[in-house]
C-alpha cells in the first residue's frame, strides 16, 4: 500500500537533528563487528579550501559522515564520541578577530551547544589535548576509530593503543540506510519544495525558448523557498537530448521539440530530493509520446505497488523490464516472444539503467552494494542489490529512451535485431526519452511517497495549457 498524504514535517523539524542517536547506532554497529570495542570515534568536517590560484573559498559542502554524527554545517570542525562514556564533543573554530570584519562573528560555543545535539562544545585548539586526556584514561587496548584520509596531519592519537581506520566509514554507511523520523521530515521538506519547483517549470515551459531559462525557474524557486543547494546538477533535456541519461548542458533551444525531461532536486539541511518528470513542451503529448509515457507510468506504478519491507530490489527491477517489454510489444517496437526478449536482454536497449537507488544525504546514497562488474547487462547498473529495510528511502525511476548510440548496436546484432521492428522504431526517435522518478520511504506494509510533483499525463497537460 502506498501513502501519499503530505507529512507534517514542520512539527518534527522544530526539534534538533538526532546526531547523538546516530552516534549510538554507529557505535552499536562497531561493537557488533568488534566485540568489546572501547575508545572513541573521531571525525573531521570539511575544511575551508581556496580555489586554485585564487583567494576565494571553494563552494562548501559538508562531509556527510561528519554531518550524520553532528548535524553541524560549519566548516573546519572536529568531533569526538566517547563510546564508553556515551559522550559527544564538537570542536568549532575559535574567533579570529581579523576575520570578523569580513565575515561577522562566528557561532559561539554556547550557540553551538544550543543548536546541535552534542554533549559538549570546545574549540578546535583543544582537540589534541582532549584526545590525549581521554585516551590516557582508557583501559589498555582502547581504539580510536577514524576514516582514512580524513584526519589532519596536526592531529595525534598517541594515547590510544589501537588506531582503527577500517570500520567507521562502513559503520556510518550501513547505518545511514535506515532513516529516523527527523531525517524523513527533512527529506519530505526537500521533496515538497522540489515538487513545487517541477510544477513551476511546467507552468513556464511553453513560454520560453531555451532550456537554461527553465533551469533558472527551478533554481529560483528552490532558492526562494530556502533550498539554496541542489542535490545534483539539474538535467533539463528537451527533445532527443532526453535520451542522454545525465545530460547537463541545459542550453539548447527548444523550438520544434516534443517533450522536456526535467530531473532536478533541491537539498534541505544536507538531505537530497531526486525527482524526474517528462511532459510535452506545447501542452499536448503526441500519440507516440503518450504511448511511451503510459508504459513508463505503468512501470513505475506497478513497481511502487510491489514495494514493502524485505522485498528484493533485483526482483522489482526485473518487474520493470517485464512491463517495458509488454508495452513495447503492444506498440510494435518490439516483436516476438516476450520471454525470449527478456532472456536476450534486448529491453536493455531501451531501459539501460537501474530502477533506482538509495537516497539520503547523497543523491546516490550509501549502502546499496552495487555490482558494476555483473556480467548480466540487465543488472549491471542497479545501484541497490538486496532486500529493502523499513525506513530506507529509494528512488523509483523507470525510463524508456531512444538513444541512437545505444540502440544502433542492438539493431546490428542478429541476437537482438530480430526482436526490434526498425520501421516502427523510426517513428519514436523524436520522443527522446521518458523517465518518471519519485522518492519512496519503505514501510512494513508498503511505501510512503515523499514526492508530490504532478505526473498524471492529463493533469500535466492541463497545467501547461492553462499557464
Curated annotation (Swiss-Prot):
- Residues that coordinate or bind Mn(2+) 1: 274, 397, 437
- Origin superkingdom: Eukaryota
Q: Which residues bind Mn(2+) 2?
A: 263, 274, 437
What's an example GO BP annotation here? proteolysis
Write down the required cofactor(s).
Mn(2+)
Which UniProt keywords are present, listed alphabetically?
Answer: Aminopeptidase, Hydrolase, Manganese, Metal-binding, Metalloprotease, Protease
Output the Gene Ontology terms for molecular function.
manganese ion binding; metalloaminopeptidase activity
- If you read the UniProt record, what top EC class would you report for this enzyme, in one word? hydrolase
What is the protein's name according to its record?
Probable Xaa-Pro aminopeptidase SMAC_04549
> What organism, scientifically named, is this protein from?
Sordaria macrospora (strain ATCC MYA-333 / DSM 997 / K(L3346) / K-hell)
Amino acid at each position: 500500500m502506498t501513502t501519499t498524504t503530505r507529512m507534517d514535517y514542520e512539527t518534527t523539524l522544530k526539534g534538533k537533528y538526532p546526531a547523538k542517536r546516530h552516534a549510538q547506532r554507529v557505535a552499536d554497529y562497531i561493537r557488533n563487528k568488534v566485540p568489546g570495542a572501547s575508545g572513541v570515534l573521531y571525525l573531521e568536517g570539511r575544511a575551508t579550501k581556496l580555489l586554485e590560484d585564487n583567494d576565494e573559498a571553494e563552494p562548501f559542502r559538508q562531509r556527510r559522515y561528519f554531518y550524520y554524527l553532528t548535524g553541524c554545517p560549519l566548516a573546519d570542525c572536529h568531533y569526538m564520541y566517547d563510546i564508553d562514556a556515551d559522550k559527544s564533543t564538537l570542536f568549532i573554530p575559535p574567533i579570529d578577530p581579523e576575520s570578523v570584519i569580513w565575515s561577522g562573528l562566528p557561532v559561539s560555543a554556547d550557540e553551538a551547544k544550543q543548536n546541535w545535539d552534542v554533549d559538549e562544545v570546545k574549540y578546535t585548539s583543544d582537540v589534541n589535548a582532549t584526545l590525549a586526556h581521554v585516551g590516557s584514561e582508557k583501559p589498555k587496548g582502547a581504539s580510536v576509530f577514524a576514516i582514512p584520509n580524513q584526519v589532519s596531519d596536526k592531529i595525534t592519537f598517541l594515547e590510544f593503543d589501537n588506531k582503527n581506520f577500517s570500520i567507521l566509514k562502513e559503520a556510518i554507511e550501513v547505518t545511514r540506510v535506515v532513516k529516523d523520523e527527523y531525517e524523513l521530515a527533512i527529506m519530505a521538506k526537500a521533496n515538497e519544495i522540489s515538487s513545487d519547483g517541477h510544477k513551476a517549470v511546467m507552468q513556464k515551459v511553453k513560454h520560453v525558448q531555451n532550456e537554461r531559462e527553465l533551469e533558472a525557474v527551478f533554481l529560483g524557486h528552490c532558492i526562494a523557498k530556502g533550498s539554496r543547494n541542489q542535490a545534483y546538477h539539474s538535467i533539463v533535456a528537451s527533445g532527443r537530448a532526453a535520451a542522454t541519461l545525465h545530460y547537463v548542458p541545459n542550453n539548447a533551444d527548444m523550438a520544434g521539440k516534443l517533450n522536456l525531461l526535467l530531473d532536478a532536486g533541491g537539498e534541505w539541511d544536507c538531505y537530497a530530493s531526486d525527482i524526474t518528470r517528462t511532459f510535452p513542451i506545447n501542452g499536448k503529448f503526441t500519440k507516440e509520446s503518450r504511448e511511451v509515457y503510459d508504459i513508463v507510468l505503468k512501470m513505475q506504478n506497478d513497481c511502487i505497488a510491489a514495494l514493502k519491507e524485505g522485498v528484493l530490489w533485483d526482483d522489482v527491477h526485473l518487474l520493470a523490464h517485464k512491463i517495458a517489454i509488454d508495452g513495447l510489444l503492444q506498440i510494435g517496437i518490439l516483436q516476438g516472444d516476450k520471454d525470449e526478449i527478456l532472456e536476450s536482454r534486448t529491453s536493455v536497449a531501451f531501459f539501460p539503467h537501474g530502477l533506482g537507488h538509495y537516497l539520503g544525504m547523497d543523491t546516490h546514497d550509501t549502502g546499496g552494494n552495487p555490482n558494476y562488474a555483473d556480467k548480466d547487462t540487465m543488472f549491471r547498473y542497479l545501484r541497490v542489490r538486496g532486500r529493502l529495510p523499513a525506513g530506507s528511502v529509494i528512488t523509483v525511476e523507470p525510463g524508456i529512451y531512444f538513444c541512437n548510440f545505444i540502440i544502433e548496436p542492438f539493431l546490428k546484432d542478429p541476437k537482438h535485431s530480430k526482436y526490434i521492428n526498425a520501421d516502427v522504431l523510426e517513428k519514436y526517435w523524436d520522443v527522446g526519452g521518458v523517465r518518471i522518478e519519485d522518492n519512496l520511504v519503505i514501510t512494513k506494509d508498503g511505501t510512503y511517497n515523499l514526492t508530490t510533483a504532478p505526473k498524471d499525463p492529463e493533469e500535466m497537460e492541463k497545467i501547461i495549457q492553462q499557464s
